[in-house]
Amino acid sequence: MTELKTLLLFLATAVAEIVGCYLPYRWLREDGSAWLLLPAAASLALFAWLLTLHPAASGRIYAAYGGVYVFVAVLWLWGVDGVRPTVWDITGSLIALCGMAVIMFAPRGA
C-alpha cells in the first residue's frame, strides 16, 4: 500500500472514530437526541472495519494510528468545536504525525 493510500485510510479511520464518539457526547453532554446513538454505532463499526484494512501487524497499526488520530482531533477542535488550535496543539499534532510516519514507513528487515 502506498504512503498516500495509507495516510488516507488512517484519516478515514480517525474521522469514523471521532464521529462515533462525538455523537454520544452530544447526546449525553449537550442534550442531544438518543437517535444520535444509531449513527454513532454505525460509525464505530466502520472504524473497526477500517482498522482491518491496514496492511501491517495490528500493534503497529494501533500505534501509528494514534498519531493520525491526534492530528485529526486537533482539526476537529478547530472545525467542529470552533476552537482555534494553539501553536502547541499544532506542534504536538505534527510531532505525532512524524511518529506515525516513522512507525509506518521506516525500512523493515526481511
From Swiss-Prot:
**Which keywords annotate this record?**
Cell inner membrane, Cell membrane, Membrane, Transmembrane, Transmembrane helix
What SUPFAM superfamilies does UniProt report for this protein, alphabetically?
Answer: Multidrug resistance efflux transporter EmrE
From the Swiss-Prot or TrEMBL record, state where the protein is found.
Cell inner membrane
Among the Pfam families in the record, one is: UPF0060
Topological relation to the membrane, as annotated: Multi-pass membrane protein
The membrane-spanning stretches of this chain are: 4-24, 33-53, 61-81, 87-107
Is Cell cycle one of the keywords UniProt gives this record? no
Q: Give the record's GO CC terms.
A: plasma membrane
* Keyword Repeat in record: no
The record's InterPro entries line, in alphabetical order, gives: UPF0060 (IPR003844)
Q: Which family would the database say this protein is a member of? A: Belongs to the UPF0060 family.
Q: Which PANTHER family match?
A: UPF0060 MEMBRANE PROTEIN YNFA (PTHR36116:SF1)
| NCBIfam families assigned | PRK02237.1
What is this protein identified as?
A: UPF0060 membrane protein azo2656
- The organism named in the record is Azoarcus sp. (strain BH72)
